[in-house]
């Protein structure tokens, strides 16, 4: 049940004339079982016999109080509870004019008017198993507003038969948001907007549209002579918020009631404009949210971007200038000239938080100047005209502008309260920066936010991610316009376009840039493709947050693993910082893999850089199922034709190898086929294979119909093979690899090293190799997609002595023996939560042996391992 559903249901109970079932109905709202409530009403579960009182074990002790005697009633039941050593969670008394309640666990009290009870629905959330502290952390008051606002949106869409996105409705909602905020923050007179609707419109909502149309005209009028008397108290707003004519809408009793409740039940002064993004998420369709990237980003996460990008430096400048009024004045001038640009601004979260931080810095500078000089005349420095953005979605674009106006008003109030004799009027509104409604990939950023090389400009944001497989036709067209001539450019995520344009913009304007991104731009196959292009613009990475979980406070938020990458023009004077969790490390250079090291890029290769045998795909049947047998089919076949046993081999693919299971295949050459071709089963199965190949539209497959008794590929081992799954879960510490004998044929869904030395399996199952795979492998969803070109052929291995190889071989054989002893599938054995401790220890022993081949000093982290591997890769590829 949504939050506002709880509130609304309690409002229904409170507004009834008959309150004889008040407690039972209240308990029902919080999902106390109906059977329990029925027995309670009958007295079966009421643990007290006192008249007018109800005691439900562990839940509540309730008492109806005499008029005006709430405290006496509460003291009375408190004494009863203490005397009986009872443990009800809540004590609750009411005379139906007021409500007094106490939470016996937290000792928190509630003392409100009876009609106000719905607003405090969260007080009794423990009945639903939700602690209030937890609730307040997860569901701020802003979300309550978002849900209530979303309900208005849904009802109006239904009442007006609106299916597609509608500009008129969207604009109406933006204006409605402003009016709610204005009446609670003294831009309008208190409650004037809601009272206007309550007193001058019919209950059925029939004349509500006309009222809104008239009001919006007045709010856009500077001349007030012909304004109707009942609207004269509403001021001229400007900012073009009300300039566009109001679109006629149908209203009903229901939508009118929801609008009034939105004004009466919410204190809009407490609602942060940066949460308006969550309102957009609440009203926008799931599809729009996913594709257009209308992210609501929490303040702590925004600070991770803007602090290292510019805010830390500005704060340090303030401290450095603290006792020097000339330096303070220079800093004041400087912060009034900086430009801030979010080219995927959504509903404006990053711009709003940045604006507020700059205004607070302005306030602190003015206060300090007044302390130093006695008097200091306030002249506005930071203005909305310094803020720029691009947003593709109309609705979010309009909310971004509205949110900036609201943020401006809030900061004007803060200024008035903090600085003596400083006043900055909100109305009439001024242009809210330059927020363009456009596709950021199709416009020149220098046209949106023009800047000379000498100007201070910061670009930041949380652009849409969208992997290549999730991109629609428009997205693919956008990407083609940028990366069409780049080899493998089609593999890049959509966010790569923002990195490209950010680098291009920085190269011509000297801007500093920072984006939140999925970690695809810093690990895996996309790294070399993207950063080869970015480095052409002469940029460097200035700071970065390595992978962390990014969540927001918006409704039903989903966490994703992201990185933050800050970059700008080449500058040896810039201190470069790597952030890992809560630690901050000063480094000489940050590579595209977010390591402390040179800008090395790992590209796919056709041959191994180390002295390694070739990694093959397994064997593709391309047989229409004719040559493959399930265990049951195989058993039936050899029971009926025992003479066929020598012509079968085990057949394993990636799924069977990791999760267990087995199939069989007919493994024939021409000579073997000639011996058994008259067998009815063989004839049937070969016929299936031949028909499949003949009907194929692929000419190569058609040729295979000439030899329908054999696989397309016919690799086999004389001894044993190293088996490498092509896909493995990202959650595993190691990719489960192993050995297969000559009696097993491996499918094309698995990689194979035929007749390899066993020590090589130890190398490939080491943490060093796993670190490499994490950094350079492609992804299938979030799982690692192993490949010969990127993972195996590029893996740098130092020269190994015979002794080292023998040590590695002994360690991997010990692991194989342990796996045999433990039993179970590889998926079970390598599940990180259930991996046997003996197996973990054996792997750690192997890791140590392999790592000492790279250096004698013990590695402290995977970051260190990757730094060493990248350096060795560079050395080996430059030889």
UniProtKB/Swiss-Prot annotation:
The enzyme's E.C. designation: 2.1.1.72
PROSITE patterns: N6_MTASE (PS00092)
Knockout or disruption consequences: Decreased promoter activity for promoters with the target sequence very close to the -35 SigA-binding box (scpA, hbs, rnhC, yumC and zapA).
Cysteine pairings via disulfide bonds: none
Reported impact of residue 465 to A: Loss of methylase activity, still binds DNA
Keywords: DNA-binding, Methyltransferase, Transcription, Transcription regulation, Transferase
Gene3D superfamilies, alphabetized: Vaccinia Virus protein VP39
GO annotation terms (biological process): methylation
First-level EC class: transferase
Catalytic activity: a 2'-deoxyadenosine in DNA + S-adenosyl-L-methionine = an N(6)-methyl-2'-deoxyadenosine in DNA + S-adenosyl-L-homocysteine + H(+)
GO molecular function terms noted in the UniProt entry: DNA binding; site-specific DNA-methyltransferase (adenine-specific) activity
Family, similarity comment: Belongs to the methyltransferase superfamily.
Miscellaneous information on this protein: The sites are enriched on the left chromosomal arm.
Function text: One studied mechanism is via transcriptional repressor ScoC (also called hpr) which binds to non-methylated scpA promoter; when the m6A target is methylated ScoC no longer binds and scpA transcription is up-regulated. Other mechanisms for gene expression regulation probably exist. Binds DNA with and without the target sequence.
Protein name as annotated: DNA methyltransferase A
Originating species: Bacillus subtilis (strain 168)
């Amino acid at each position: 049940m949504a939050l506002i559903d709880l509130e609304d249901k309690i409002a229904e109970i409170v507004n009834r004339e008959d309150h004889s079932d008040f407690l039972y109905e209240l308990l029902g709202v919080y999902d106390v079982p109906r059977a329990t409530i029925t027995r309670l009403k009958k007295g079966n579960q009421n643990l007290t016999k006192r008249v007018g009182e109800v005691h439900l074990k562990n839940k509540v002790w309730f008492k109806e109080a005499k008029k005006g005697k709430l405290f006496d009633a509460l003291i009375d039941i408190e004494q009863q509870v203490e005397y009986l050593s009872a443990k009800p969670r809540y004590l609750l008394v009411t005379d139906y004019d007021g409500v007094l309640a106490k939470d016996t666990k937290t000792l928190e009290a509630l003392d409100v008017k009876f009609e106000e009870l719905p607003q405090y629905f969260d007080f009794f959330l423990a009945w639903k198993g939700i602690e209030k502290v937890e609730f307040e952390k997860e569901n701020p008051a802003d979300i309550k507003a978002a849900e209530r606002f979303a309900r208005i949106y849904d009802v109006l869409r239904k009442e007006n038969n609106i299916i597609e996105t509608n500009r008129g409705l969207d604009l109406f909602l933006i204006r409605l948001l402003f009016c709610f905020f204005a009446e609670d923050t003294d831009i309008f007179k208190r409650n004037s907007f809601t009272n206007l609707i309550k007193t001058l419109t019919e209950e059925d909502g029939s004349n509500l549209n006309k009222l809104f149309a008239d009001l919006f005209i007045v709010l856009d009028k500077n001349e007030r002579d012909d304004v109707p008397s009942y609207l004269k108290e509403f001021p001229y707003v400007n900012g073009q918020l009300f300039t566009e004519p109001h679109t006629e809408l149908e209203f009903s009793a229901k939508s009118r009631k929801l609008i009034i409740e939105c004004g009466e039940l919410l204190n809009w002064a407490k609602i942060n404009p940066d949460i308006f993004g969550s309102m957009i998420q609440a009203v926008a369709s799931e599809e729009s949210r996913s594709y257009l990237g209308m992210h609501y980003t929490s303040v702590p996460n925004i600070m991770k971007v803007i602090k290292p990008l510019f805010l830390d430096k500005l704060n340090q400048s303030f401290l450095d200038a603290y006792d020097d009024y000339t330096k303070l004045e220079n800093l004041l001038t400087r912060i009034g000239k900086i430009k801030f640009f979010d080219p995927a601004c959504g509903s404006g979260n990053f711009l709003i938080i940045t604006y507020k931080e700059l205004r607070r810095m302005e306030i602190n500078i003015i206060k300090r100047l007044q302390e130093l000089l006695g008097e200091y005349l306030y002249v506005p420095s930071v203005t909305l005209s310094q803020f720029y953005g691009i947003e593709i979605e109309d609705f979010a674009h309009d909310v971004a502008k509205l949110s900036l106006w609201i943020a401006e008003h809030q900061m004007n109030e803060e200024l008035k309260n903090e600085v003596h004799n400083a006043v900055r009027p909100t109305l009439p509104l001024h242009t809210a920066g330059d927020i363009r409604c456009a596709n950021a990939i199709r416009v020149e950023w220098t046209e949106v936010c023009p800047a000379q090389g000498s100007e201070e400009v910061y670009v930041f944001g949380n652009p849409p991610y969208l992997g290549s497989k999730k991109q629609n036709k428009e997205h693919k067209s956008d990407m083609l316009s940028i990366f069409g001539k780049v080899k493998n450019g089609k593999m890049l995520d959509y966010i790569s376009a923002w990195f490209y344009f950010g680098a291009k913009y920085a190269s011509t304007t000297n801007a500093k840039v920072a984006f939140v991104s999925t970690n695809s731009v810093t690990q895996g196959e996309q790294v070399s493709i993207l950063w080869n292009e970015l480095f052409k613009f002469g940029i460097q990475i200035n700071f970065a947050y390595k992978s962390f979980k990014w969540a927001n406070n918006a409704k039903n938020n989903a966490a994703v693993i992201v990185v933050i990458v800050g970059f700008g023009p080449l500058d040896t004077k810039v201190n470069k910082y790597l952030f890992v969790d809560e630690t901050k490390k000063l480094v000489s250079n940050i590579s595209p893999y977010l390591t402390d090291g040179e800008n090395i890029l790992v590209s796919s290769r056709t041959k191994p850089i180390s002295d390694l045998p070739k990694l093959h795909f397994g064997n593709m049947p391309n047989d229409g199922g004719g040559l493959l047998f399930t265990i049951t089919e195989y058993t039936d076949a050899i029971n009926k034709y025992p003479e066929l046993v020598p012509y079968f081999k085990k057949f394993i693919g990636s799924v069977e190898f990791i999760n267990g299971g087995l199939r069989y295949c007919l493994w024939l050459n021409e000579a073997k086929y000639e011996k058994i071709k008259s067998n009815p089963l063989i004839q049937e199965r070969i016929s299936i294979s031949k028909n499949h190949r003949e009907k194929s539209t692929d000419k190569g497959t058609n040729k295979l119909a000439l030899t329908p008794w054999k696989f397309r590929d016919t690799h086999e081992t004389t001894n044993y093979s190293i088996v490498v799954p092509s896909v493995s879960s990202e959650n595993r510490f190691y990719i489960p690899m192993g050995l297969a004998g000559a009696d097993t044929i491996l499918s094309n869904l698995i990689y194979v090293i035929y007749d390899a030395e066993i020590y090589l399996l130890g190398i490939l199952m080491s943490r060093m190799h796993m670190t490499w795979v994490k950094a350079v492998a492609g992804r299938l969803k979030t799982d690692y997609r192993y490949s010969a070109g990127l993972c195996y052929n590029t893996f740098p291995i130092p020269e190994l002595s015979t002794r080292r190889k023998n040590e590695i071989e002994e360690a991997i054989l010990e692991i194989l023996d342990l796996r045999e002893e433990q039993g179970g599938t590889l998926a079970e054995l390598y599940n990180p939560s259930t991996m046997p401790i003996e197996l973990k220890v054996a792997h750690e022993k192997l890791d140590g042996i392999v790592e000492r081949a790279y250096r004698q000093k013990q590695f402290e982290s995977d970051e260190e391992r990757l730094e060493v591997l990248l350096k060795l890769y560079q050395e080996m590829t430059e030889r």
